[in-house]
């Protein structure tokens, strides 16, 4: 999942 990546963007 990339969701966890964009939340830290």
UniProtKB/Swiss-Prot annotation:
Main localization category: secreted
Tissue expression as described in the entry: Expressed by the venom gland.
Signal peptide: none
GO CC, one annotated term: extracellular region
GO terms of biological process kind: killing of cells of another organism
Subcellular localization(s) per the UniProt record: Secreted
UniProt entry keywords in alphabetical sequence: Cytolysis, Secreted
Function text: Presents moderate hemolytic activity at physiological concentrations (micromolar range), and weak lactate dehydrogenase (LDH) release from mast cells. Does not induce mast cell degranulation, and antimicrobial effects. In vivo, injection into mice causes moderate edema formation, but induces very weak or no change in nociceptive sensibility. It also causes an alteration in rearing (standing on hind limbs), but does not impact locomotion.
Protein name per its UniProtKB record: Cryptide Pep-5
Species annotation: Tityus obscurus
């Amino acid at each position: 999942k990339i969701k966890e990546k964009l939340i830290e963007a």
